[in-house]
């Protein structure tokens, strides 16, 4: 996997647990936030394509990737935002361009709402940072007590389904790439973060993270004046065009690339197109 992910590992300690991140290149900061069930591996091609001109920082959320996977941990959106806040503080990051995917949207925009002065540009990949009732049946099943634990932790169903379905250009999901995505989630204990993310989706007002997401949603409009780019996989069975239209309503001036032949893992499907799009976007919107 070193050939696919040729980066130096860094870690900071958070409450005695290891919080892993990569920090490649120099220049303006690009902070790349993954979702579930991926890890910083998802951004490897973007990092390789952009680190010559930019500083690319990509953490693994606690319970994911190369970060520790404690079994008794507060795996909530608020905690993930706290962890990101600690990393940004440790690295003294400012003038940040946020690149977010999946759960990375809620985590990243949650951080942005807390520290709007630190955020200068936004790049969105098939994500949400607002409340929605739209959730596929298979995701609902994974939230059923008992069943979700057996399916996600026992059989690794969530991560296996993702490598099978989230990338539409099947030639991209080689044995090596597939192994890279699955490597951190190789046993029951190491799948704790994957399950907790699914359980933390706020589907009702009494959900733990409901008020957190509601607050983020209510504060998104303050970023309307920022440059925003959206690259959206049109064949995503979770974050479909309903979510894209919601983002366009919030950020009507956003530069949108709807990638017709890409799925949920839009960066995996279309990184050769996305890298020059990001480069052009950054150059046209200087700090």
Q: Which residues does each predicted region cover?
A:
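Conserved HGGG/HGGXW glycine-rich cap/lid loop of the alpha/beta-hydrolase fold
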Residues: 23-66
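Short hydrophobic "strand-cap" motifs at the C-terminus of beta-strands
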Residues: 33-34, 231, 259-262
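Flexible "cap/lid" subdomain of the alpha/beta-hydrolase fold that forms the substrate-access gate
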Residues: 2-11, 19, 42, 57, ...
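A conserved catalytic-core segment of Leloir-type glycosyltransferases
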Residues: 2, 26, 261
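Catalytic histidine-centered segment of alpha/beta-hydrolase-like enzymes
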Residues: 262-271, 275
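Short phosphate-engaging motifs
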Residues: 29, 39, 158, 190, ...
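A short loop-to-beta-strand scaffold at the N-terminal edge of the catalytic core in hydrolase folds
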Residues: 15-23
């Amino acid at each position: 996997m070193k050939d696919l992910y040729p980066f130096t590992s860094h870690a900071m300690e958070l409450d005695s647990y290891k919080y892993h991140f990569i920090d490649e290149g120099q220049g303006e900061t690009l902070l790349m936030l993954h979702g579930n069930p991926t890890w910083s591996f998802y951004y490897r091609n973007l990092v390789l394509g952009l680190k010559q001109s930019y500083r690319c920082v990509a953490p693994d959320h606690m319970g994911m990737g190369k970060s520790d996977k404690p079994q008794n941990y507060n795996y909530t959106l608020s905690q993930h935002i706290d962890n990101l806040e600690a990393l940004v503080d440790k690295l003294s990051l400012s003038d940040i361009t946020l690149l977010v995917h999946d759960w990375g949207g809620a985590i990243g925009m949650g951080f942005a709402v807390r520290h709007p002065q630190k955020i200068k540009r936004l790049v969105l990949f098939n994500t949400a940072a607002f409340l929605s009732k739209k959730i596929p049946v298979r995701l609902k099943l994974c939230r059923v007590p008992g069943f979700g634990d057996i399916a996600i932790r026992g059989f690794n169903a969530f991560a296996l389904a993702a490598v099978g379905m989230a990338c539409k250009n099947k030639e991209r999901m080689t044995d090596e790439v597939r192994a890279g995505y699955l490597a951190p989630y190789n046993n029951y204990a190491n799948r704790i973060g994957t399950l907790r993310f699914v359980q933390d989706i706020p589907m009702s007002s009494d959900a733990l993270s409901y008020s957190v997401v509601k607050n983020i949603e209510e504060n998104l409009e303050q970023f309307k004046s920022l440059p925003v780019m959206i690259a959206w996989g049109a064949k995503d069975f979770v974050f479909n065009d309903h979510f894209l239209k919601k983002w366009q309503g919030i950020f009507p001036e956003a530069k949108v690339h709807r990638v017709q032949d890409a799925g949920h893992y839009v960066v995996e499907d279309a990184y050769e197109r996305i890298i020059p799009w990001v480069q052009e976007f950054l150059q046209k919107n200087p700090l």
